[in-house]
Each structure stands twice: as structure tokens, then as C-alpha cells.
């Protein structure tokens, strides 16, 4: 059988492949086509209940209820920022909470989704890192975040979701298999049918997994939370850099580009008295020479401990000028959703 035999422990039906569903129905004396129907309801139609499956008989729906559950997420609380950004506090089936964000602009709507409850890493400037990792999200929990934000985009902005960034809670490359299964569902014609080129995975820099991403021929875009191109500084603000130093990261990124020819985006915050010197900017310029890239200079979004402060505008301008003079594409990115703690680095389940 393709489900748990203990009646009080029903299996989440979305853990089954389409082929497993087809075999289940054949074993129950039905046609394999019924499995295809159910699979379509679960993914492309994102059904949250077996009762939603209106082209399936009541008897079959009851049989599904007897054997399976659909562990869908629930938007427990939605907050709207003065700039239009929406933050969802998402309740999981085990009562844990993650957050996801809809970021609207004039031309697009972007979903910022979470991959873990908490985070595996220990970036000192990030509110999520203070939570520590409780567990990885499974593929359907990631998928459901995207579906919820797509629905909100259509409802509030009258257009479908256009882009997805894995920049919410968690380090996506530390939940590699589930993240990639979710991406597969999101991009499949049997799922949401989104182009993988509209999906960006943002990592703090896990060299081994960046190489695996390249070997697996992922068509997504890659962003790296860099924040310093000097090991002594990066280790101070991102302690895991002691294990995964910049030399290893550089090698992995060179490997990524050699396999994919896809340009990398570096996310970079300039902090007062941490990385706001010409020496820091020069180190970034040198690091950018290794592979084709662009740099996003990001406004810092403060968290409660107050240990980090945004550098003066002159420091950001110095970075921008130096990068541009060296032929490196650079964008100064304004934060969205700050007033509801929805901006980059602020997701900490405060609304839960």
C-alpha cells in the first residue's frame, strides 16, 4: 500500500507522486486516471480539502478522507505595509509558524518565501538567525506559500505573481532537496507553470551545495548574501564563514558560472564601523572580478539588539562609485515593508 496502515496516522497525500497515486487507485479497483485527477487537484488547483474535488464522486472523496490528509498551510495573520507590501504569518500543520512576504512594484509582484522554521546559520545581523532552526519546510509547505501570495497578488493587485525569491526565513541550500522539489512543482505545467528564470535562490554561501546546484543543472538564478569580501570581517558578522571562507565560496561560484553561465547577484549591506571603509569597497571590487555579477547595495533593516547601524550615505555612495568605475553593475535597493518587520533580515515571527 502507498499509505500508512495505522488508521489514526493518515499520510499526507501530497507526499505521493502522481505514479503512486495512480497505483493506489488501481489497487482500490479504480482507474489510474483517477490518480491523475486527484494529483491535478492537489497541485495545479491547490485544493485544501478533498471536498473541493468536485469532479470526483462522494464515495471516492470519502475513501480519500479515510486514508489521507492534506497538510496545507494557513495564513494566520496578514499585515499590510504603508508601501503596499504584505506579510503573512503562516501556520503549519504542527502549529509552527513561518513568514512570507508579497512585494509589489509597478511592473511586478514578488513572493519572498521561507525554507526553514528558523535558520541553520548564525548571521549576527538577521532576526531569523536568533530563532535557530526548528525544522526544514517540506516541498508542499514551500509551494503553499507561493500559492497564497499568488492569490493575494491577484486579489489586491489584479495580476498574477511574477517572481519568487527564496529570501525569507532559513538557508535554502541547507534544505536543498525539499527546496528543489518545491521548485520542480512550481515550474511544472502540472503545478504553477512558472519559468525557473523567475526564481532566485539566495544563499549565505554554502560552497558544496552551490556546486550541487550547478551539477543538477538548475535553471534558477543565484544570489549570495555577501556583506564583506574580507574574511576577518565576514567571520565577525557571519560566523559560519570560518567554516566556509571566501576562498571556498569563490571557487564554488566560479564552478557555478562555468556550468551555468548565469550571472550571480551579490547582496551587500554597508554598516557603520564594520565594512564602511575604502579597503572594504576595494575588497568587494576584487571579489566581483572572479565571475560576472551584479551587486545590490541594500538598506539595513534594524533588529532589536541594535548592534548594527546603517552606514552614512557617503559610504554607500563610495561603494557605488567604486563599483561603477570598475565596470560592475550596481543597484541601491530600498527596503520594503519595514513598518511591519517584513523587510530583509527582519522576519522573526513577531506577528505570531
Curated annotation (Swiss-Prot):
* Regions that span the bilayer: none
Q: Name one GO biological process term.
A: tRNA methylation
Keyword terms, alphabetized:
4Fe-4S, Cytoplasm, Disulfide bond, Iron, Iron-sulfur, Metal-binding, Methyltransferase, rRNA processing, S-adenosyl-L-methionine, Transferase, tRNA processing
User: What Enzyme Commission number does this protein have?
Assistant: 2.1.1.192
Q: State where the protein is found.
A: Cytoplasm
Question: Which major enzyme category is it?
Answer: transferase
Q: Which GO terms describe its cellular component?
A: cytoplasm
Q: In which residues is [4Fe-4S] cluster bound? A: 119, 123, 126
Give the required cofactors. Answer: [4Fe-4S] cluster
Which Pfam families does this chain map to? Radical_SAM, RlmN_N
Domain named Radical SAM core: residues: 105-339
Name the catalytic site residues: 99, 344
Predominant place of localization? cytoplasm
Question: Could you name the domain of life of the organism this protein comes from?
Answer: Bacteria
Reaction it catalyzes: adenosine(2503) in 23S rRNA + 2 reduced [2Fe-2S]-[ferredoxin] + 2 S-adenosyl-L-methionine = 2-methyladenosine(2503) in 23S rRNA + 5'-deoxyadenosine + L-methionine + 2 oxidized [2Fe-2S]-[ferredoxin] + S-adenosyl-L-homocysteine; adenosine(37) in tRNA + 2 reduced [2Fe-2S]-[ferredoxin] + 2 S-adenosyl-L-methionine = 2-methyladenosine(37) in tRNA + 5'-deoxyadenosine + L-methionine + 2 oxidized [2Fe-2S]-[ferredoxin] + S-adenosyl-L-homocysteine
The similarity comment for this entry is: Belongs to the radical SAM superfamily. RlmN family.
An additional note in the Swiss-Prot or TrEMBL entry is:
Reaction proceeds by a ping-pong mechanism involving intermediate methylation of a conserved cysteine residue.
Q: What does this protein do?
A: Specifically methylates position 2 of adenine 2503 in 23S rRNA and position 2 of adenine 37 in tRNAs.
Q: What is this protein called?
A: Probable dual-specificity RNA methyltransferase RlmN
